[in-house]
């Protein structure tokens, strides 16, 4: 049902507007179908619990007493069209499958990844028990420096401090680059995800950060 609603939101321009707001451009790849909900008939009202990672700015993040981000506003648009009440539940990426299986959340939305330590067979079994949407936005992890920085190569960062979020995907990506890791003086994990990392970089508290390309698009558009 949510997938059908997303097709309608793509057709009426809602997703395009959200993408421009958060990224400055629309690189989303949602299927578009203005009549996707027509065959579903009456849609019963319900409460929809969105499991989100609150450190994946600008997709989903803690904002004061609530949450904000592209995925959060997209979920709001989905529930508004379906007549559902939206609730949020903060979850860790590594626990997404458990949270879904236990019924604590109806959907894991915003930065969810399958456990990279799982075997291929284990991943396939998990996928068979979940309904997955097609990927709708390419989001890469990048090593980022300030525009006025003297650092221009990985080797030039030798002995410096690099910040990254607490989510395991950041450290896993960095650890996979052994040669690069050996150059750093310190790879420091901070709470607050990409948002906190960009704020520290702007303040000159570190030489570089590991952050999402979606966050870079937000800060540079």
Task: Tell what function each PLM region has.
Residues 134, 145-162, 181:
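Flexible hinge/capping segments at coil-to-helix
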Residues 1, 12, 17, 22, ...:
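Extracytoplasmic small-molecule ligand-binding "clamshell" domains
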Residues 95-101, 109-127, 173-178, 202-221:
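A ligand-binding cleft/hinge motif common to bilobed small-molecule-binding domains
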Residues 125-144, 193:
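Short Pro/Gly-enriched coil loops immediately N-terminal to beta-strands
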Residues 44-54, 68, 154-172:
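Short loop->beta-strand "edge-of-pocket" segments that line small-molecule binding or catalytic clefts
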Residues 6-42, 169-192:
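Ligand-binding clefts/hinges and TM-proximal coupling segments of bilobed small-molecule sensing domains
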Residues 136, 144, 165, 186-191, ...:
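Soluble extramembrane regions of membrane proteins in the secretory/endomembrane system
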Residues 23, 53-56, 93-94, 112-114, ...:
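Solvent-exposed coil/turn segments that connect beta secondary-structure elements
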